Amino acid sequence: MAMRAEEADRPDLAYYEAVPYLLVIESVERHGQWLRRAEHPELPGCVVEAPSAVEALEELERERRRVLRRLWDGGGLIPVPRPPLRDSRSHPAT
């Protein structure tokens, strides 16, 4: 299948995975229990809740990768509010 011109210019998924998205963690009460809510507000729908901050961060990382993959596979726009920490196009992952 031929690649469209805009797809040829699109960075690979690793490029987007290296973007340092804002991270927000807060304590929230749900049904009499305190949970930690973690989110990347710049990525639509990238939010999780867990009993501890560590668990929330671990779950958020999995969710971030799912959201990026879903946007990537769907050809949607992926927010890039700041440059990646590393540019996978010039420094391939080992």
Question: What role is predicted for each listed range?
Answer:
Residues 1-26, 54-94:
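Short, charged, surface-exposed hinge/linker loops at domain edges
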Residues 33, 46, 75-77:
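Intrinsically disordered, low-complexity regions
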Residues 35, 48, 58:
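Short acidic, gly/pro-rich beta-turn/loop elements at beta-sheet edges
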Residues 26-43:
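Short aromatic-glycine-(Arg/Gly/Cys) micro-motifs in beta-strand/loop hairpins
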Residues 44-55:
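A short, exposed loop/beta-hairpin motif centered on an aromatic-Gly-Thr core
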